[in-house]
Amino acid sequence: MQVELADRAAARPSETGEAPPSSPAAAAAASAAAEDAPLLPGGGGGVRRRVVVSERFRQRSGSFRREVRRAAEETYLLTRLTLILLRYLGIGYRWIRQFLALCCYTFLLMPGFIQVVYYYFFSSQVCRSVVYGEQPRNRLDLYIPTDRTGLKPVVAFVTGGAWIIGYKGWGALLGRRLAERGILVACIDYRNFPQGTIGDMVEDASQGIAFVCNNIASYGGDPERIYLVGQSAGAHIAACTLLHQAIKESGEGDASTWSIAQLKAYFGISGGYNLLNLVDHFHKRGLYRSIFLSIMEGEESLQKFSPLVMVKDPAARSAVSLLPRIFLFHGTSDYSIPSAESEAFFDALQQNGAKADLFLYDGKTHTDLFLQDPLRGGRDKLLEEIVTVIHNDNPDTSAQHLAVPVARRLVPEFMLMLAGRVSPF
């Protein structure tokens, strides 16, 4: 079976994002020097102050105009893509029912969402929309621990969203919780369908990982301790990215901007790993076959983008040996993506020589592990497992990070229970 993925980004620069930040102390000193410039003439001091203020005003005005223009462009793009998507969806009742359920679900969890959104936009720990590539939505958000001493372990997170509604902001709650435990988090955005297909999503994820590997030290992250995490569709995209990179490195592939060896482990949360088994399942739940096959670039590409199939391919045996440790998490009451997906992927990994662990959570649904449980507060078993693995790799981890703080409740229990009943996931 042909399992190699053409390197769509070979002709493009590997790093087109923001330059790493300069020293905060240097920036503060420069700002203070400008503010303290003399107002009286003599040696040109007054002129210098007026020029600095005028230049700063022009820069701010230009920046504001750029933001307005970008917002207008993104609004237009979103509207156009929505219309395209609606043409794909047609008037089938299943997706309409799912959409209405999603609205009810969102309303019931709104008390928690409001608090997370406030944190996302106003916390000094969040560095939003760092550019990592040339394509639309090639942005990532950084969640930086308050303790800036030393380099921190890093999580590169690929969010879910059924390959259609994924957004880097969905990782805000996870980013916050991990940052509280001394872990720097990079939430990678990527093109969704119909703006891109699965090949574009994998390409974007790969470029985002490359940016993290090559630049995270400038933000206080440790390039020797990077962990890849994916949830739902993001778990599938991240697993595909990981395997395609391993296949490239094990063969005669082109030179890449990052290496599998730079990742300490992969955590897959509620992921789907065999698309051949999921086509009919998704169709029954409202993600119609025609749309799903369009996302996956046709029925002939399902095997190429099925991590379980790739792992079983004898031609990929040398690539599997390059994989980092793999940890899979799944709820047994997940109806969006059955837990059998993680179980089968775990078995295939073990049978082909990969180091893998599987954690099943009785009675947990598709969103319990990632959303309802963190909003509930208290002990978060999934988060504890991830944090334990990361900090166990660092014998010098401080006691304050090993002692997991108890998170406060963000949504009343009765609203969480109702949300669980109406959840479309």
Swiss-Prot record:
Membrane-spanning intervals of the chain: 99-119, 154-174
Biased composition (Basic and acidic residues): 1-10
GO molecular function: prenylcysteine methylesterase activity
Subcellular location, record wording: Endoplasmic reticulum membrane; Golgi apparatus membrane
Active site location: 232, 334, 366
Top EC category: hydrolase
Low complexity biased stretches: 24-34
GO CC term (a single one): Golgi membrane
Homology family: Belongs to the AB hydrolase superfamily. Isoprenylcysteine methylesterase family.
The protein's role, per its UniProt record: Catalyzes the demethylation of isoprenylcysteine methylesters.
The protein's name: Probable isoprenylcysteine alpha-carbonyl methylesterase ICMEL1
Protein's gene: IMCEL1
